[in-house]
A protein has these predicted regions:
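Extracellular/lumenal mature domains of secreted and surface-exposed proteins
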Residues: 1-297
């Protein structure tokens, strides 16, 4: 009673011939069928992917000599598919075992296993102390709130004006007034990246200045004419003048006559339509005029 394993799939005729010790013989023939086995195999477009945008495409490379096949995929995360060459996106970062089970129409089967790696992607967040600031004294404080499930990450800040930083939570002052796009790019130790963009506004500051027709005048007939020399890159302005004697004006270029002789500090306060301000100060001198008097005998 022999045992035999066939090295190929096919249909074979098995013949048993029995011979007696007296030379009498007989034979019996039966047929055995060795069905073809599928040879399961598959490839992956990229077995190591970052979580953000992960998309695993599985190409079925299974073959069989004859017959048809059905497929059962399990992706290691509870999901499955019966298509020939499926795609799968994972909902979390982890290591997963992908299994392909192939069954032929004659109920012969084979399996193939491969591992996919979904690396954690950085989750970006940052805040700004104030995204709208006037040019004078502008200082933007960027507080990094980024996180990652496992591993480490590096930071790259692009301030939108040609300058950058690699610190975690930088502080930056702009050299011009404008609108800037700030971009934070984080890269994990496994090469996964993400970016976040926000806009900051540096409003133009007025540059306050003025001239005086004559800053030193005698009391009699004094008349100080103030010429407004303020400028701003863009926008409109309003003005508040204080003359140092309790009087004020909102005209652009006012005139003023003092009611007493003294030294006065004139202040021009300029506010833009975006609430940015600047001031200029100058001194006026009102000299006492003689008071003539004489008597006659």
């Amino acid at each position: 009673s022999p045992t035999h394993s066939y090295s190929t799939d096919d249909t074979f005729t098995v013949k048993l011939v029995n011979t007696s010790d007296l030379g009498c013989s007989d034979s019996l023939v039966k047929t055995v069928y060795v069905f073809p086995n599928p040879i399961a195999d598959f490839s992956i477009n990229d077995s190591q992917q970052c979580f953000n945008g992960n998309s695993f495409a599985f190409s079925n490379l299974t073959n069989i000599n004859t017959g048809t096949m059905s497929y059962a995929w399990t992706f290691g995360d509870g999901n499955s598919s019966t298509t020939s060459s499926p795609s799968q996106s994972y909902a979390s970062d982890d290591t997963f075992t992908v299994r392909l089970v192939v069954n032929s129409n004659l109920n012969c089967s084979d399996s193939a296993f491969k591992t996919t790696y979904v690396f954690p992607s950085p989750v970006l967040a940052f805040s700004i102390n104030d995204s709208q600031q006037c040019f004078n004294g502008n200082q933007f404080i960027f507080t990094n709130g980024s996180a990652i499930n496992t591993g480490s990450q590096t930071y790259y800040w692009d301030y939108g004006d040609g300058n950058s930083s690699t610190t975690s939570s930088p502080t930056y002052s702009y050299a011009t007034d404008d609108t800037f796009t700030v971009k934070l790019v984080n890269t994990s130790d496994l090469g996964c990246t993400d970016s976040l963009v926000k806009t900051v506004y540096v409003f133009p500051n007025p540059i306050a200045d003025f001239s005086i027709n004559d800053s030193q005048q005698c009391f009699n007939g004094n008349s100080f004419a103030f010429t407004n020399l303020t400028n701003i890159n863009s926008g409109s302005m309003n003005y508040v003048w204080t003359f140092g004697d309790g009087n004020s004006s909102t005209a652009s270029s006012p005139s003023h006559a003092y009611a007493s002789d003294d030294t006065f500090t004139v202040r021009l306060l300029v506010n833009s339509n975006l609430n940015c301000s600047d001031s200029a100060f100058k001194t006026t001198y009102v000299f006492p005029s003689p008071v003539p008097a004489f008597s006659i005998n």
